[in-house]
Amino acid sequence: MAEIIPMTEEQKFQLEIYKLVMNQNAAAEEAFQFIGTDELKLELFKIHFQSGGANSDITTRTIEAVRKSREALDLFTTGA
C-alpha cells in the first residue's frame, strides 16, 4: 500500500481558503496573495467574503473582500 503523505500546515491553510472561494482558482490566487499565512488576514477575509452580498461572481467578491479586509487591517495595527 502506498504511503499517504500528510498535508503541511500551509497546505491546510490554503485548502481552507480554496474551499471558501468555492474552488475557483482565480479567486483563490487573489486570496492567497493577500492572506499569505496570516491568520488575522484570513479571519478578516472570511468576514468580508461571507458578507459579500448579492455578488455571485466569486472572483469579484474575493477582490472586494480583499479590499475591505485591507481597510479593516488598519484597525489592528499598533497605535490604531
From Swiss-Prot:
Protein name: Uncharacterized 9.0 kDa protein in gp15-gp3 intergenic region
